[in-house]
């Protein structure tokens, strides 16, 4: 039987007060989708995400002018805030100094290994981890053009080079992600990452997964495989939808796999010719009412004598 327990072999890092890796439960994340200048809007979204069960929140920091807003959000946020940085090592350094609980940098656009040195120094001084976040759509051009490697191998090669560089600089609080938009590539990549770097905590996800229905199917199929095999220390289900739906999806998947429970599980039959009641609207109404209940209970709604009372 595959191992569904949290991966105790990975190095544990702290994101604020949240333990990630080292046998800790898989941490649920989401990402804010408002401009940083809307401080109150972002804080309101963080509060809603926290109520939904989010444990770590990420926010894009695209411009130097955003840093003051970012700092204010970090100070007032009830959740640890991860700074999502692309294209600028300087922004990563400043975000570390201004309250980020963790940095996310992209090897494909941060400016090369040497540009990462001051970022590592800033993170070490702040006592925060860094996620090396590789994406299939933004691989380093030299690596992307190699014909001797498959796409999963390219993603793993990029991540491995940066992790080894970080370790060589004496920085070990590293988390890795390597995402693609399709499930087979995602699963193959994370399996290979887990084999190549078993001690490094992994942030799992299917990037650009799509709108609610498609995104849920793709993410559940891909992440479900990985989590069932004990791969994944933290997760985000990326959806083109309200971020709270991402959090609900994460908890539903973790619950379905028997890994973590915080909300009710609705058990309802699909209906057939034996159904004695108009079950579909009843089940939908029960599901709606259960949204505000946060207890790991089971609630059954059945429509005939085969599966249960009507």
Language-model-detected regions and their locations in the chain:
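Glycine-rich, proline-tolerant flexible connector loops at the mouths of alpha/beta enzymes
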Residues: 33-42, 50-77, 104-112, 174-183
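Catalytic alpha/beta core domains of metabolic enzymes, predominantly
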Residues: 134-135, 143-301
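Structural preference for beta-strand elements that scaffold enzyme active sites
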Residues: 10-12, 25-29, 56-58, 80-84, ...
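Alpha-helix-loop-beta-strand connector modules within alpha/beta enzyme cores
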Residues: 64-85, 118-130, 192-202, 286-290
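Active-site mouth loops of central-metabolism enzymes
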Residues: 15, 22-41, 60-62, 79-87, ...
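Glycine-rich phosphate-binding active-site loops on the catalytic face of alpha/beta enzymes
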Residues: 53-55, 98-113, 206, 229-243
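N-terminal amphipathic alpha-helix/helix-capping segment at the start of soluble metabolic enzymes
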Residues: 1-31, 36, 124, 288
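Hydrophobic or amphipathic alpha-helical targeting/insertion segments
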Residues: 90-131
């Amino acid at each position: 039987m595959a191992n569904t327990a949290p991966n105790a072999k990975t190095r544990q890092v702290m994101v604020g007060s949240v333990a990630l890796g080292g046998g800790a439960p898989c941490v649920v994340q989401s990402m804010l989708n408002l401009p940083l200048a809307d401080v109150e809007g972002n804080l309101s979204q963080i509060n809603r995400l926290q109520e939904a069960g989010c444990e770590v929140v990420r926010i894009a920091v695209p411009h130097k002018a955003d840093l003051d807003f970012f700092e204010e959000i970090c100070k007032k946020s009830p959740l640890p805030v991860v700074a999502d940085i692309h294209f600028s090592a300087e922004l990563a350094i400043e975000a570390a100094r201004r309250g980020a609980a963790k940095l996310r940098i992209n090897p494909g656009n941060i400016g090369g290994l040497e540009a990462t040195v001051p970022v590592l120094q800033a993170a070490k001084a702040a006592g925060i981890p860094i996620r090396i976040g590789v994406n299939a759509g933004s691989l380093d051009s030299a690596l992307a053009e190699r014909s001797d490697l498959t796409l999963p191998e390219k993603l793993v090669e990029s991540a491995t080079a940066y992790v080894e560089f970080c370790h060589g600089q004496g920085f070990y609080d590293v988390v890795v992600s390597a995402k693609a938009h399709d499930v087979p590539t995602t699963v193959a990549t994370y399996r290979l990452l887990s084999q190549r770097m078993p001690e490094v905590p992994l942030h799992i996800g299917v990037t650009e997964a799509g709108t609610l229905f498609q995104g849920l199917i793709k993410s559940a199929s891909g992440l479900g495989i990985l989590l069932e095999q004990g791969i994944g220390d933290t997760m985000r289900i990326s959806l083109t939808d309200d971020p709270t739906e991402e959090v609900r999806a994460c908890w539903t998947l973790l619950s379905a796999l028997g890994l973590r429970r915080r909300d009710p599980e609705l058990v309802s039959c699909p209906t057939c010719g034996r159904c004695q009641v108009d079950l579909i609207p009843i089940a939908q109404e029960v599901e709606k009412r259960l949204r505000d209940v946060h207890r790991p209970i089971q609630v059954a709604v059945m429509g005939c004598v085969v599966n249960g009372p009507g």
